[in-house]
Amino acid sequence: MKGTAMNGILPLYKPTGMTSADAVYHARKILGIKKIGHSGTLDPNVDGVLPLAIGAGTKAVPQLMASGKVYTGEITLGFATTTEDLDGEVVDKTPLTQPFTADQLDAALTAWTGNITQIPPMFSAVKVNGRRLYEYARAGETVKRPERQATVSQFTRTDEPVFSATDGTQRFRFEVHVSKGTYIRTLAVDVGKTLGVAAVMSQLTRVKSGGFTLKQAVSIEQLKAHAAAGTLADVIQPIDIAFADLPQVDLTVEQFEAISHGRFLSLDQQTPRVRLHFAGVLKAIYRREDDQYRPDLMFLANEKNV
């Protein structure tokens, strides 16, 4: 399969210590294809699911990015850093003399559940006046950061909190379900603010993204093994998995000929968008407009990966 046309989605496992760009580089080298993009950056100190779009699958990146994400991680109370995680320098300490109760911690998480407003951390890739925030931060500059809206559909504690009287800290693990663009580091800091203490995100793993779970993710080593064995089709998922929530329409030969020329279709459907299949393969996404379906995304060259 290497060196041939490949189209699809690869749920890759990115380990800590690797950038998302590095992960794409390794995938390009292993697969022998340049047209690969990812659907949401993972910081180097975060591991987890990084869906990669391959070939024509890159057209599905916006759809993948729009899907919700699930993380598990750890929050530590008692100090804050420049980066809101353990990579930064400590800038504030509020040593705990006694632990918060489980109920107090749970209430703080509940306070940040629902539709929330966030201010992106200075060490982030958000652009302000043409420069990324981390560029300002590295230069020792501060700048007004735009507020962002996010949705946290679930934010729960998943273990018993651990208190250290020696360090004056308390840590606990959590699971959070969020919309795209949500900063988990900032959520950790905000939880601390609700409790009246400094806080950091001390560990994070993305366990679901683009509809793919951690169990489905393939490591770089596993990807190499599949490439060597000629079994890449076992791990590269078809493009239409990104559009699984859309109704599927199986085209006739005449209908496929019509969409091959960009023509509109009259279909017995009412949904805003549909996915069009021919010979068992996704060929297009059409959108409804004026009682007809018109081209939205085209995948005419898409074939089954073998």
Swiss-Prot record:
Keywords for the protein's UniProt record, in alphabetical order: Isomerase, tRNA processing
EC class name: isomerase
Enzyme Commission number(s) from the entry: 5.4.99.25
GO molecular function, one term: RNA binding
Domain of life: Bacteria
Alphabetical GO biological process terms: mRNA pseudouridine synthesis; tRNA pseudouridine synthesis
One Pfam short name: TruB_C_2
Catalytic activity: uridine(55) in tRNA = pseudouridine(55) in tRNA
InterPro entries: PsdUridine_synth_cat_dom_sf, PsdUridine_synth_N, tRNA_psdUridine_synth_TruB, TruB_C
Active site (catalytic residues): 43
CDD domains: PseudoU_synth_EcTruB (cd02573)
The keyword Coiled coil is assigned to this record: no
Family listed: Belongs to the pseudouridine synthase TruB family. Type 1 subfamily.
Matches recorded under PANTHER family: PSEUDOURIDYLATE SYNTHASE TRUB1, TRNA-PSEUDOURIDINE SYNTHASE
Function noted in UniProt: Responsible for synthesis of pseudouridine from uracil-55 in the psi GC loop of transfer RNAs.
Protein's UniProt name: tRNA pseudouridine synthase B
Gene: truB
